[in-house]
Amino acid sequence: MIIYLHGFDSNSPGNHEKVLQLQFIDPDVRLVSYSTRHPKHDMQHLLKEVDKMLQLNVDERPLICGVGLGGYWAERIGFLCDIRQVVFNPNLFPYENMEGKIDRPEEYADIDTKCVTNFREKNRDRCLVILSRHDEALDSQRSAQALHPYYEIVWDEEQTHKFKNISPHLQRIKAFKTLG
């Protein structure tokens, strides 16, 4: 089972395309939708939904995957639910760059302070990070600096922020999922 979390643009047709691409790894891909506008509510909702899926799950090696803001959530929810994560161009600093787009961007900073101390250290090697060198929305070098001490970084030379085509990375993701 692969759980897919969309980014800020929840209505993008690219979400469906990514789900179809992920089905080459596992036919059981589940899209979990969330508001993107209310961080504390989103965290509660995502934890509840992912936990429910895991309770009914028969896959011994489930995976959670997210793009952009979905990557922010996939890393945290995956850690809290003890499943491996794959994140594409994760938005690591939404409290800085979501101003004017959501109601309370400061809630992300609050979530960061309330999350498990040094959670990335405790999550070491359980998240695969795929970053685009051509991310027009986020500073991928800053993301790499924050995540490299804990996770493997894979660089993509073609894609932009929304990562329309993940197929060149499917074999790597499949191998990572198999490690479970």
UniProtKB/Swiss-Prot annotation:
Belongs to the UPF0227 family. PANTHER family: ESTERASE YQIA-RELATED, UPF0227 PROTEIN YCFP. This is UPF0227 protein YcfP. The gene is ycfP.
